[in-house]
Structure formats: structure tokens, C-alpha cells
Amino acid sequence: MGPVQHPAGLTEAQACGSSVRNRPAGQQGQEQKAMPAEPPHSTVTEGGRTLEVRWIFPGRLEPAVAGWFGRFPAGTESREDTYLLDPRLRGLSVKVRGGGELEVKVYRGSPGILEVAGRARGRLESWQKWSFPFSPPGPDRGERAGWRPVRKRRRISRFSRASSQIVARVPGPGQQPECGVELTEIRVRGQDWWSLGFEATGPAGLLRSELQATAALVFAQALPGGMEPGTDDSRSFAEWLCQRPGTGSDTGA
């Protein structure tokens, strides 16, 4: 297999973790010119542990499902994430997030199954992530070998405990334990999909209880049409992309 190409602005050194210090002087100069300039204060951001569950479904998001999710206050976001698929790095999820940072997630295992009786069942996944800022040097030139762009339009609600009860709040910055819930419209290689995901953050000992309490609240009202998310549809974005490559083009999506 030939050398892996990377999205604009991401050099081989950034993608593979190699150092330019041990390279010949001429090669160092070439690589330094290729790398986008970053402010001196740029640092790696460690997001800590998360506990997540996600379901991904084929087809367009139905208005009835959007209405079901609309019971809670939500923010919206549209962006394109680009995932590294080849080489496949087991236990790692690598993506360029919205063109502004490289995000690396390490899989820490599954503590079991989330089950909301009669409403939903999915595989819980524990992750730890790091973010590396970078700036693309020029406009995107389309899909690069080994990478898969995914267009997303997300509705995001956040839930936290208050007076021993789980309550929804308007999305925003904060350090308190919480669980984010996102309903996402997906466009990849000319195909429409949608996803429902939960992500708990905060102290490790509270992650599962936060996620379970949030899921119980969200699924207190069943999904429209008797839909019941199950383990067959439960997986991370990276795993799903490797298993369902899709066909066609995103042109005009």
C-alpha cells in the first residue's frame, strides 16, 4: 500500500507522531514549510474520559423524530468531520474535526449494555480523547485517500443533575458532570443517515449514572412509529464507517 495521504494542512509528522528533530537539515526545512504556523501558546487538549452510546440508522431523519427530540432545548451545529479509515488503527478513532483540530480517541472498553426497558438497548463505550489544533493552509481539494469526509447537522441538548433530578439545560461551556445528547443528520458519499448519541462527561464514577438517568428521561417518551434502537445499530462513527463504506459522491449533497 502506498503512502497515506492526509487532509489539507495535516503532514505525515502530525499524522504518525514522528519528530522532525532527527531528520536531515534539508528535510527539516521542507517539513517546517509544509506545516501550518500555530501560535506559541497552542497546546494539546485532553478531554478526559467519556462514556458513550450511539445508534446510526439509514435514510433521512424523519420530521416526527426531530419533533420528538424537540421536547428539549437544543443548540444546532453544521460541520464536516474527516475520519482516518486506512490504515485502520484498532482501538483508535482519528478525525479532523470541522477542519480546525485533529482529534484522537482511544477506546477503553465497554462496561456493558445500556437498556431502557421497551425503548432502547445499546452498547456502552468508554473513550479518552486528545485534541491537537492545526490550520489548513488552503481550500479543501476533495476526498483524500484513506480519509472519509462526513457532513453532519447536529441538534445537541445537555442534561445535568440538579436537586437529585436530571434536567435539560441550554448547551454551553461548563465543567460540571453532564450528558450531551445529539440527534445528527449525516451525509456521506451521497447517502443519507441519521444518528442518536449520548455522551457523559465528568468524574469517572458518575459517568454511567449520568448517562442512564439522561437516557431514562429522553426515552420516557418512545420514539415515533414504535422504533426501538437496538444493539445491531449501536456503534461508534469510526466503526460504522469501516463497516459501511457507502458508494457514490458527496457532490451536490
How does the language model describe each region?
Residues 27-30:
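Short, charge-rich patches within N-terminal targeting peptides
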Residues 36-45, 50-53, 245-252:
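Hydrophobic, proline/glycine-rich low-complexity stretches
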Residues 40-49, 56-178:
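Charged surface patches that recognize polyanionic ligands
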Residues 53, 175-204:
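Acidic, contiguous internal or C-terminal segments within carbohydrate-active enzymes
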Residues 190-246:
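Mixed-charge, glycine-accented linear interaction segment located at domain edges/termini
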